[in-house]
């Protein structure tokens, strides 16, 4: 005999055709809510129910990468959009059942779906009023450093989630992908999905951090909910030079050491500049090795520094709340190619993905910027709002501008 497991052999899948499984999870939900839990993140939320009869998947779990976009003419275009193990219609019955259980306790309990489904429309099905609360927006994460792709995802997400009465969400990193402080340093055609190892091309750390700070500031300017992955507030990069013998991701073992896997984004956080584990624990031993110099990213190293990534996160989150951006809306303004410019309430949000500075005309004061003073000359106009009512946004930069007068204009690149 055997049991079905979509992932590691140590993780057998539950049989959701068994009534006892449903009762087990109803009890589980009540147990934790009674102890004060306010929400649940559901891992692989699209993978609970399997197609009847458990048919084989001709392409396997990576069918979307192999088959291409549903809009493309591929050799596999006649296959279903999803494999028999994922995104089956019956999965929604389970979440309706869970929602009923949680509604019975009389509290607003959050259910968040980690669902790697093909489109935003598919993801929106999980957050209908009688199902889950929110779903991670992985198309936004996958849009990369591409202004057109980002705008498309934003528009489609706001439309699809809005159609079911749910807030849009935004995310740039998680435990399954290369950290965006490293991922965004690569060219668009660089596939980082399998992870990055010491034999792969190494990212430009300075470029990656500049883009990561800009992408985060832009994301926090959008309406909806923004999700942060532990360590990104420190500007942590991927550990790309981890020794092979230290890797623990099952993907590494199951692929005969061909795929580096996800260990690089799961390295324990640094808390102090120095120490055997940079303050992570008292023993100095960690399950994954921390790279040399990890302490320079620690909160201890960044506290009190106006230019630090930690300070940027704290200030932008506080300002986002003060300005009510999470409950706002998106109005796109004219801008040059490669530049995203939108109005959210009385705030203009700018992202420059190009390699040239861009001038934004008709602005009020600058509220916050992603770039550090060390990245521009002290006399550079990018550091200040020009007297003529314009601001220069440097390459790979983002900022928020006071647009209460409604005069912001994309202007010309320079």
Task: Locate predicted features.
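Active-site and adjacent substrate-binding regions of carbohydrate-active enzymes
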Residues: 1-363, 367, 371-414
